[in-house]
Amino acid sequence: MSRIGKMPIPLSNQAKIEIKDSNIRVSGPKGTLEQRLTDQVTVSEENGLVTVLRIDDSKKAKAQHGLYRMLISNMVDGVTKGFTRKLEIAGVGYRAELKNDLLALTLGYSHMIYFKAPDEIKIEVPDQVTVLVSGIDKALVGQVAAKIRSFRKPEPYRGKGIKYEGEVIRRKEGKAAGK
């Protein structure tokens, strides 16, 4: 049995779960998330624990078992605590600011980059070189953070660009000088 899939998901008293046909809905103080289930797994809830079981031992069912267990676990965490990704901007003159609901980035190009986040995502700029992306859907938070990072990925020679908090940029040496 899948090591991840066999672990039950504890429900906090703030989170409620509804299972209808092949849909699962998790609601909590921060919002509501829905997920469509595959026919390879079944989900049940009893005594504040959610269990995910697979219908057979096929290779596909085994793969789906752990996947859906983690998706549901992330949904429960999202509606109770939420998720946040922190981005750091490094480089002379590189900065971010929030204009209305647009993230305005100055990243060394001849123009500013304006980014509109989806409605479910909240973007904060505590200072000019830090961007916080938060929301209840872990995948969407990661996707938006990756999109913002893609505007100017960190380069290996000087380390300029946008990186995740704690990300280690492998640095390279420049060209060796001639004789």
Swiss-Prot record:
<dbReference type="GO" id="GO:0002181">
    <property type="term" value="P:cytoplasmic translation"/>
</dbReference>
<comment type="similarity">
    <text>Belongs to the universal ribosomal protein uL6 family.</text>
</comment>
<dbReference type="InterPro" id="IPR000702">
    <property type="entry name" value="Ribosomal_uL6-like"/>
</dbReference>
<protein>
    <recommendedName>
        <fullName>Large ribosomal subunit protein uL6</fullName>
    </recommendedName>
</protein>
<dbReference type="GO" id="GO:0003735">
    <property type="term" value="F:structural constituent of ribosome"/>
</dbReference>
<dbReference type="InterPro" id="IPR020040">
    <property type="entry name" value="Ribosomal_uL6_a/b-dom"/>
</dbReference>
<dbReference type="InterPro" id="IPR019906">
    <property type="entry name" value="Ribosomal_uL6_bac-type"/>
</dbReference>
<dbReference type="GO" id="GO:0019843">
    <property type="term" value="F:rRNA binding"/>
</dbReference>
<dbReference type="InterPro" id="IPR036789">
    <property type="entry name" value="Ribosomal_uL6-like_a/b-dom_sf"/>
</dbReference>
<dbReference type="GO" id="GO:0022625">
    <property type="term" value="C:cytosolic large ribosomal subunit"/>
</dbReference>
<comment type="function">
    <text>This protein binds to the 23S rRNA, and is important in its secondary structure. It is located near the subunit interface in the base of the L7/L12 stalk, and near the tRNA binding site of the peptidyltransferase center.</text>
</comment>
<keyword id="KW-0687">Ribonucleoprotein</keyword>
<keyword id="KW-0689">Ribosomal protein</keyword>
<dbReference type="Pfam" id="PF00347">
    <property type="entry name" value="Ribosomal_L6"/>
</dbReference>
<comment type="subunit">
    <text>Part of the 50S ribosomal subunit.</text>
</comment>
<keyword id="KW-0699">rRNA-binding</keyword>
<keyword id="KW-0694">RNA-binding</keyword>
